Amino acid sequence: MVSLLVTPFLQTALISFVYAFVFISLLGCESFWKDSYLFQTVAFSLILTVLANLYADIERLLGRHVLKGLLFGTYSRPKNENRFVMFLDLAGSTAAAERLGPLKFHAFLNDFFCDIARPIINHGGEIYKYVGDEVIITWQEKYAGSAHDPLTVFFDIDDVVRKRHNYYTARYGLIPKFRAGLHFGTIVAGEMGLTRQEIAYSGDVMNTAARIQSECRLRNEIFLVSDDALSRLKERADFPSSVIIVSHGTVSLRGKSSELAISSVRL
């Protein structure tokens, strides 16, 4: 609560200082006080702070780049985009929900999603959506800065959870376990809805990434990647040499008519 009050106050003070400095530089100190520019400075700073915080809160609610896309009409017409898509699922969530109860399980999920947000952002990922106990992460191919990002983000998330071991054990009596599937392909991105508008992603790559993630449990793996995604990442000079790739060959995914080559990735 204190931080919610202090941060806007500091922002207002900083903007007021900069704005006052500009006025004094242009008009002189005497004119600044004489013509009551102090009130204008504070009022302008307050308005600017409110607008900046409002934008930040809405962007946090909608997701990175989504608000900008809606404001500028980037996706007013659906467009094709090449993206890496990861479905990351919390393992054993049904048992955890029964053990913790609805409210505490919600807090458990929220803690987990908050903890993994930073490594996702650090690796250039966009959190597209939370679906129950699952998070969908995407990288635009042209903005996926490093070949490390769609692969090593999984292991950085694991490191974050390990470091929070004591916290999760003390509060919930269990540690989050998770599995992920990564795929690459063309999605269709466009605005969807009227009363509640969002930028929606659709296409075969979304369904396939979800099916790859489902294969993790069947194959006793924690991270499976399609060879389509691996081959695209291997084209880059900075492909991480530290990862261990174990091929599972071509497999039949549930609900898919054609087979797909997948591999497990480990460090």
Predicted regions and their residues:
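Cytosolic regulatory/linker segments at or just downstream of nucleotide-handling modules
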Residues: 218-267
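Regulatory cytosolic signal-relay segments
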Residues: 21-81
